């Protein structure tokens, strides 16, 4: 397991890096005192979870020896890595001007330029021990996250999770949906007394819907639309794509079609989840 220690000058992108690491599965803690690193690592060792911790000028150890001792006290399962982010002086000044945030050392009545320079001196002991130093001066937020994924996972894109969920319009549209497709115009198994108590997960309902050409056409055209734009969505630094399929009650048509789409993209090697809001409500 890895204990990634993220440090660097304020405004260089530590928060962005920590969010990217969290998306990669790291357990992330912002501004944890160095002396508590071994305790955090021990609490995660049994769970087999890598961790990432940010350290800035506010929680710097008083001496390099304290940092070294904390590294020695880490459980054997953890391999510490120190990532140091930096940017040139003018870039840091511009970023502070854009965000209008206060520098951590501004309480010392220093100008922004002086605070940046003093911070560099205070962080030098960590910078000199860094396993990787990254200059973010010319990087966007997305480029920094992409670089970290490439370095740590060996791939550029974050793995996108596709979520296909069915719902009933009479219960409301899911607020977390990126795309909403209305299938209320398709043939409705509800009007068959034998099928009415069943759901789109049952074979007789699936057989009923499978007999209709318009159902096949809708599934084909919907998956074609998603396939067309999926490459761009995968490179857009997002973790989830939620596709909501709605019918009147959320019991038959939407359930069947959500499952068909989920199975298709799962067979193409995508990371897929499916859920059925109305059916889950009935269980609870």
UniProtKB/Swiss-Prot annotation:
Residues annotated for ATP binding in this entry: 8-15
Keywords recorded for this protein, A-Z: ATP-binding, GTP-binding, Nucleotide-binding, RNA-binding
Annotated positions binding GTP: 56-59
Region of interest called RNA-binding, as start-end residue ranges on this chain: 266-284
Gene Ontology terms, MF aspect: ATP binding; GTP binding; RNA binding
Subunit structure: Homotrimer.
Record NCBIfam families: PRK05416.1 (NF003828)
Role summary: Modulates the synthesis of GlmS, by affecting the processing and stability of the regulatory small RNA GlmZ. When glucosamine-6-phosphate (GlcN6P) concentrations are high in the cell, RapZ binds GlmZ and targets it to cleavage by RNase E. Consequently, GlmZ is inactivated and unable to activate GlmS synthesis. Under low GlcN6P concentrations, RapZ is sequestered and inactivated by an other regulatory small RNA, GlmY, preventing GlmZ degradation and leading to synthesis of GlmS.
HAMAP family: RapZ_like
Family: Belongs to the RapZ-like family. RapZ subfamily.
Name this polypeptide is given: RNase adapter protein RapZ
Gene encoding the protein: rapZ
